[in-house]
UniProtKB/Swiss-Prot annotation:
Classification of source organism: Eukaryota, Metazoa, Chordata, Craniata, Vertebrata
UniProt motif (Nuclear localization signal) ranges: 272-275
Description of how the protein assembles with itself and partners: Interacts with ctnnb1.
Function text: Acts as a regulator of Wnt signaling pathway by regulating beta-catenin (ctnnb1) nuclear localization.
Similarity comment text for this entry: Belongs to the FAM53 family.
Name this polypeptide is given: Protein FAM53B
Cellular localization per UniProt: Nucleus
Keywords: Nucleus, Wnt signaling pathway
An annotated GO cellular component: nucleus
InterPro entries: FAM53 (IPR029356)
Chief location bin: nucleus
Region of interest (Disordered), ranges: 204-286, 306-380
GO terms of biological process kind: positive regulation of canonical Wnt signaling pathway; protein import into nucleus; regulation of canonical Wnt signaling pathway; Wnt signaling pathway
Amino acid sequence: MVIILKKTLEKKGADDVIASRANLGPFQAQTMSQGAALFSCGLMETSRWHDSCSIRQRPVGTSLESLWDVLPEVHSGSAQWDWDVGSASSTLTSLLQDLSLTESSSHSTAPPSKKQCRSLSCSDELGGCRSTWRPQGSRVWTTVEKRRCHSGGSVQRSSGGNLQLGFPAMQRSFSFSLPARSNAVEPPSFTQRLPYAFTSLTHSSSMPLASDPPAQPLSLSNEQICFPEPHGPSPSSSPDSTPELERRSGQGGLARSRSQPCELNEKKIGVKRRRPDDTHKQRPSLDLAKMTQKLHSFHSLSCPGITGEETCESEATPPPRSVQQRDAVDSPAHEHNLKDFQPQEGDFNGNKSSDPITEEVDWNCDDGTPETSNGKDTEPLWVGLCSMKRDVYQLGGELDIEQIERN
């Protein structure tokens, strides 16, 4: 900052010497009046910059007013150029360059705000030639597309009828700003970015939106600009989730992904999908009477001499089995007899596997009955065969050789 101040002071002193020694002739007042811009440098009228950017008045000699003090008085009649055009043009261009430097760095003690820097760096003449600066995604600048669902580009127009009043809000939605002009002339750089439909609607003399007292939303986005028809949003959608439902209505509306909540208005969101009642099948209830009846019929068919009562009585008082009885059960003669009875075992096993509780009851009853039958020597041979058959049922219909060897 100190180096810039020293350089500007030196240039200012050199400009004063050049201005005092310059011998300029009479000059036409029309060509050098305080117009909107001088040459193509992008310098605009000082009063407009002061009005728009609210910059305080600087002393004479640091602004463009020193240029008019340097120039001599103007003849009232038709003036003619008496001085050399080349030297005068070079003097004027050097004055303009030095004045622009002093004007930008004169208030360097208090740095200008962000708005002033941005507005001074973009002029009307240069803005029309080059593309406007658009910030990319970073921590400070966020693109508009990320938050379009919540804030969007919608601007509530005022009912005064002047469309220029809505421009600052629109500039905020585009994340860039232009110098706010005191007059109602549209900035050319902003006009160049907008589609043709929006600019033609701006310059039209009679607009239907200006006469309506209620404010209507103006849809503003990078893809397309459309004025929605005035009908209220649907009651099922909240304004936070669906900013403008009308933006997607019509042929030229914006394309929106199907996962957005505005596309799912017909469906109920947040409600659990329950299965229909037809799919629930009642589980079969356990019929204990039928199970006991099956048990009695099974015992009567397998061993005709032993009924269900005898089986339960023998289960109540089981005598301890001796080693000789176990050896007699495990003899190969009994195994040979068991092979003869195996086709009937399959039939009874199929009946047993239908009910798990019946299997458990049969298992408990089978534990007691063979012990009593093998313990009595006076019983006939078929009682021992029946008891061996029940031992086979206890093993699941197949002979477990490892269990026999272990016994």
